[in-house]
């Protein structure tokens, strides 16, 4: 925060605040540290914004999918992972409501088959993360993708997707659990 005081204008402080809020999903992600929260609170005071209102407006703007192509929505946060036996991709799409995410899921499902072929991966998962409910519905495609997901999170495999309550971080929650299950299958 001390370094941000020298930045000189509210815009730069709001930008730093936005980065922290986005990275920590409004402090709901397990990646959030006490330092993240204290720095964000200090930046909010300096930038003269109410942090809750600012975060809500920021996420609502970020989850406005109108005018975006399926490809733009899908690839805005997509990463490929490798194990000894397979390559798989995970996209994460966040919004403020399950309804928004359900609409996006309908749009994305047919595109996932194309992603498998274009990226030459075995499986693809999409985390549809509801920020306010602190949960992710996972939709998937590829051979054994649903079986692996269900086994990893001790959930029944469902073709329409699997709801994982409390799972919002791809890095700290989703990928380690999924990769552990894949390692057990080797």
Predicted regions located by residue number:
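Single conserved hydrophobic/aromatic residue that forms the stacking wall/gate
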Residues: 1-7, 11
């Amino acid at each position: 925060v001390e370094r941000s005081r020298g930045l000189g204008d509210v815009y730069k402080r709001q930008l730093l605040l936005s980065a922290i809020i986005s990275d920590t999903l409004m402090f709901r992600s397990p990646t959030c540290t006490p330092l993240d929260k204290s720095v964000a609170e200090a930046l909010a005071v300096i930038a003269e914004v109410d942090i809750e209102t600012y975060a809500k407006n920021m996420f609502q703007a970020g989850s406005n999918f109108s005018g975006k192509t399926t490809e733009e929505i899908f690839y805005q946060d997509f990463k490929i992972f490798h194990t000894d036996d397979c390559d798989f991709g995970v996209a994460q799409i966040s919004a403020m409501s399950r309804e928004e995410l359900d609409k996006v899921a309908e749009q994305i499902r047919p595109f996932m088959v194309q992603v498998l072929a274009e990226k030459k991966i075995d499986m693809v998962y999409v985390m549809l993360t509801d920020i306010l409910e602190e949960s992710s519905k996972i939709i998937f495609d590829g051979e054994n993708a649903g079986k692996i997901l269900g086994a990893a999170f001790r959930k029944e495999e469902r073709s329409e997707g699997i709801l994982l309550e409390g799972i919002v971080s791809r890095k700290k929650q989703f990928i380690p659990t999924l990769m552990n299950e894949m390692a057990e299958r080797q």
